[in-house]
Curated annotation (Swiss-Prot):
<dbReference type="InterPro" id="IPR011761">
    <property type="entry name" value="ATP-grasp"/>
</dbReference>
<dbReference type="GO" id="GO:0046872">
    <property type="term" value="F:metal ion binding"/>
</dbReference>
<comment type="similarity">
    <text>Belongs to the D-alanine--D-alanine ligase family.</text>
</comment>
<dbReference type="GO" id="GO:0008716">
    <property type="term" value="F:D-alanine-D-alanine ligase activity"/>
</dbReference>
<protein>
    <recommendedName>
        <fullName>D-alanine--D-alanine ligase</fullName>
        <ecNumber>6.3.2.4</ecNumber>
    </recommendedName>
</protein>
<dbReference type="GO" id="GO:0071555">
    <property type="term" value="P:cell wall organization"/>
</dbReference>
<keyword id="KW-0464">Manganese</keyword>
<feature type="binding site">
    <location>
        <position position="258"/>
    </location>
    <ligand>
        <name>Mg(2+) 1</name>
    </ligand>
</feature>
<dbReference type="GO" id="GO:0005737">
    <property type="term" value="C:cytoplasm"/>
</dbReference>
<feature type="binding site">
    <location>
        <position position="272"/>
    </location>
    <ligand>
        <name>Mg(2+) 2</name>
    </ligand>
</feature>
<keyword id="KW-0460">Magnesium</keyword>
<dbReference type="Pfam" id="PF07478">
    <property type="entry name" value="Dala_Dala_lig_C"/>
</dbReference>
<keyword id="KW-0067">ATP-binding</keyword>
<feature type="domain" description="ATP-grasp">
    <location>
        <begin position="110"/>
        <end position="306"/>
    </location>
</feature>
<keyword id="KW-0961">Cell wall biogenesis/degradation</keyword>
<keyword id="KW-0133">Cell shape</keyword>
<feature type="binding site">
    <location>
        <begin position="138"/>
        <end position="190"/>
    </location>
    <ligand>
        <name>ATP</name>
    </ligand>
</feature>
């Protein structure tokens, strides 16, 4: 059985908040269950709560030592729940209000990137009505995304005028505000940031124009390559940019930063940051931590919990030594 870093894990209660009403509900439920199972193996007293109108009363009655925020999407990872938990006086995992809110908003994130000198795709912001009227925007191809959303839900890659006109058939997937950005062909890569360090970058191989919902969550539709097959300087740039954005936003404990590398033009573009990375069996951040640092899923969950509770100095020294030994080594082929 895994052993928690917490000396008193068996006395600590953790409420795992997941589900909710966002389009990413199923992903959140899957990740939340996996986290709760890990907490149980570690000896914590874990309870799963599906976010709804009764959740505030349930949390106040439980008075858990910690709330593990396993929510995704609007109202889950956009700072709403973090702010609510702050008001209730309950400690929680993951980034707090400001970092979560800005990180969830793709437009605000791009303005932060500009201030940091980090390259990103050209973009514009349109309303749903403007998109459905086929207003001329960027040159083809381009990608349409909800300003606030994840799991590639409501994302469309548009390569021609006819595809743009066909968007009306998918009107139900469009939000009131949508971001339109240039399509960057090339390698899709993701960088894991954990406990103040950029850990490593993974490459994703899949069929199609974009890293779709099915490619993310259906077994066998995406191949994970670690470390990413990038030029040495580009690989290191993913680490540098990911950590810089994580720190600038004030992210807590962990984040995942997504990139596209345009091989033909040797250009790296930062797409977005996820302050609440997935924890399903196909999620990349736990996999990178295993392949790069030897941290299994239970250990990762334990570290997230302990970082939220405040790791004591002796345990922090152990973690720093562990992470330092693994992260200081460059991947062999980059």
């Amino acid at each position: 059985m895994p052993v928690s870093l917490a000396r008193n894990a068996g006395m600590l209660s953790v409420a795992v908040l997941c589900g909710g009403s966002s389009p990413e509900r199923e992903v959140s439920l899957a990740g939340g269950k996996r986290v709760a199972d890990a907490l149980g193996r570690l000896g914590y007293n874990a309870t799963v709560l599906d976010l709804n109108r009764e959740s505030v009363g349930q949390l106040l009655a439980m008075a858990p030592d910690l709330v593990y925020n396993a929510l995704h999407g609007v109202q889950g990872e956009d700072g709403c729940v973090s702010g609510l938990l702050d008001i209730l006086g309950l400690a929680c995992t993951h980034s707090h209000v400001a970092a979560s809110s800005v990180g969830m908003d793709k437009v605000l994130t791009k303005h932060v990137l500009k201030s940091l000198g980090i390259d990103f795709p050209k973009f514009d912001v349109l309303t749903k009505e403007e998109l459905l009227s086929a207003k001329e925007v960027l040159p083809y191809p381009f990608v349409i995304k909800p300003v606030r959303g994840g799991s590639t839900i409501g994302v469309h890659a548009i390569f021609s005028k006819s595809e743009y006109l066909d968007l009306s058939a998918h009107a139900d997937t469009l939000e009131d505000r949508m971001i339109v950005e240039e399509y960057v062909s090339g390698q899709e890569v993701q960088t894991a940031v954990f406990l103040g360090r950029a850990i490593g970058t993974m490459e994703l191989l899949f069929e199609g124009r974009i890293y779709s919902y099915d490619a993310k969550y259906v077994e066998g539709l995406c191949e994970h390559i670690f470390p990413a097959n990038l030029p040495y300087d580009i690989y290191n740039l993913t680490l540098e940019w990911a950590l810089k954005l994580h720190q600038c936003l004030g992210c807590k404990t962990l984040s995942r930063v997504d990139f596209r590398y345009d091989v033909a033009n040797k250009a790296l573009k930062l797409l977005e940051i996820n302050t609440h990375p997935g924890m399903t069996v196909s999620s990349t951040l736990p996999e990178v931590l295993w392949l790069r640092c030897g941290l299994n899923f239970d250990h990762v969950v334990d570290l997230i919990v302990q970082d939220a509770l405040g790791i004591d100095d002796s345990r922090r020294a152990y973690i720093d030594e562990l992470m330092g030994k693994t992260v200081s080594r460059e991947p062999s082929h980059v």
